[in-house]
Amino acid sequence: VVTPDVVVVGGGVVGLAVAEELAGSGRRVVVLERDRVGETCAAAAAAGMLAPAAEADATPPVTTQLALESHRMYPEWVARLESASGMSVGFDRSGTVVVGLDADDLRELVHLEQAQRRFGLRTRRLSAAEARDLQPSLGPSVVGGLLLEDDWQVDPRRLLQALQRSLEARGGRVVEGAEVRSLRRQDGTWRVSTRGGDEVAARTVVVAAGAWTPQVLPADAGPPLPVRPVRGAVLRLGAGLETARVVRTPRVYVVPRAWGETVVGATVEERGWAREALAGGVYELLRESRRALPCVDEMPLREVAVGFRPAIRDNVPAVGAWDDDRTLFVATGHYRKGVELAPLTAAVLRRLLDGGDHPLSSYVDPRRFGRAA
C-alpha cells in the first residue's frame, strides 16, 4: 500500500495544478489518473483562452470575479512553471479581437462591452479596418469589433506537460491508468482502490476528476454533487494566422499558436458520455470560422479533439472540503474555465489544507448543494 500525505484523483489541468501546489508545500503527493495525462481530460480538447472579458456577458458574476483573480495570478504562475519544467506553455498576451459580421453581431458586442465595463475591464471599439490591422487574416465580412487587451491564451497540452514536470521535480508522482474503483475511510485514513487492484492510503484526498468526480465520491460522504459531462469538440488546423491574436465572433473562436497551429472551437453538446464528434458540429465550426477568416479553407485539418467539460448546476466551481473533518476535498465544476481557474483553485485548496481559509473559498464551497455527513 502506497502511503503519501495527499492523493489527488484526476490528472487534468486542475488536478495537476492542485497537486503541484501541494507538493511545493512539502507534502508527499500522488496523482491517480484514469488514462494518460492529457488523453481524455477536458483540457486536452480546450483552446486555452484566458478570457474573462470576452465571456463577461455569458458567465455568472461570481465566476467572472474568480476568473479575474486567477487572471492576475497567471503571469507569475506561468513563469514559475516554465522555469521549473524547462519548457514553454505557449503563454501569449497579444490580446483578443472580437469581431462582428453583421448588424446583429454588432448589437451583441454592445451588450458585451457593457458587461465588461461593469467589471472594470479594458475594451476598445474597432472599425473593420482597425480590426484587420490587428489581425490581418480577417476577411471582408468583418464590419467592426472590440479589442480585449487583457484576454490571453495558453496551450493546455503544453501546460499539462509543464505541470507534470514541475510536480515531479517537487517530489510528486503521477500514476497513469489508475481508474479509482472505490474510496473509503478506515481508521482515520482514506483508502483509494483502483480497478487494477492497487491501493493507496492517505489522510487527505482531493477529488479533481472533472466530470467524473461524482462517480468517485463515496455515496455516504454527502448528497450527490450536481456535476454532469458536457461534450465539446475543437478542430486543430495545421497552420497559423498572421498574428497570434485570438479571434472571436459571437459563434466561434479561433486561437492561433505562434508555432503554426490554429484551434477552432467549440461545440457544446449535452450527450452524456458519447465521445464521437458529430459531423454537423464540425461543419458549423468550419462554416463560422471561415466567415471571419477565409484562410481557414486552405488549412490542413489535423485533429478533431473531444473532451467532457464538468458542468455544474449553478455554473460556479465547487472547490473545498466535502466532509466535516476536512480530509476529503473536491475541485470540479469549472466547466469551460478549468485552464483559466487552475492557479486560483490550487491556491484555495492549499490554504484550506494548511488549516486556514481563503477570501474566495465561501463562493466555491461545494457544500452549498447540501451539507456532507
Model-identified regions with their sequence ranges:
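Helical element adjacent to the flavin cofactor pocket in flavoenzyme catalytic cores
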Residues: L146-G196, V200-T204
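Helix-loop-beta segment of a Rossmann-like dinucleotide-binding subdomain
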Residues: M87-G100, L112-E113, F119, T123-R170, ...
